[in-house]
Curated annotation (Swiss-Prot):
It holds the Pfam family Ribosomal_L31e. One of its GO terms (cellular component) is ribonucleoprotein complex. The keyword Zinc-finger does not apply. Belongs to the eukaryotic ribosomal protein eL31 family. SMART domains: Ribosomal_L31e. InterPro entries: Ribosomal_eL31, Ribosomal_eL31_CS, Ribosomal_eL31_dom_sf. It comes from Chlamydomonas reinhardtii. One of its GO terms (molecular function) is structural constituent of ribosome. GO terms for biological process: translation. The keyword Signal does not apply. SUPFAM superfamilies: Ribosomal protein L31e. This is Large ribosomal subunit protein eL31. Keywords: Ribonucleoprotein, Ribosomal protein.
Length: 116
């Protein structure tokens, strides 16, 4: 059964909880925060179907907030698939990842955010 490719062309914003400690298991201490950034990129690329992933400065500060060794266990992130305005861009869509305002994760799954 083939997936419908036309769905990946629409703009959408979703809110996810990413479990970083699960993704950083058996990583040496001095590589935890850089690997966490790479894992967030990989996660966003997978769920949104775009290879162009851009991270917000606030997200980077949230990952590095407790230093290089002690990254947050879970992080609530907002991923937006947006249209690329560059004429010479390889892809027509890109993903923009930022940190969610509400960091509580209890009872929250994936939420589609309605743009106002």
């Amino acid at each position: 059964m083939a997936k419908d490719k036309s769905r990946s062309k629409e703009q959408v914003t979703r809110e996810y909880t990413i479990h970083l400690s699960k993704r950083l298991h058996k990583t040496s201490f001095k590589k935890c925060a850089p690997k966490a950034v790479k894992e967030i990129r990989k996660f966003a690329s997978k769920v949104m179907g775009t290879s162009d992933v851009r991270l917000d400065v606030k997200l980077n500060k949230a990952v590095w907030s407790k230093g290089i060794k002690n990254v947050p266990t879970r992080l609530r992130i907002v991923i937006s698939r947006r249209r690329n305005d560059d004429e010479d861009a390889k892809e027509e869509m890109y993903s923009f990842v930022t940190v969610a305002e509400d960091q509580s994760t209890k009872g929250k799954g994936t939420v589609v955010v309605q743009d106002a």
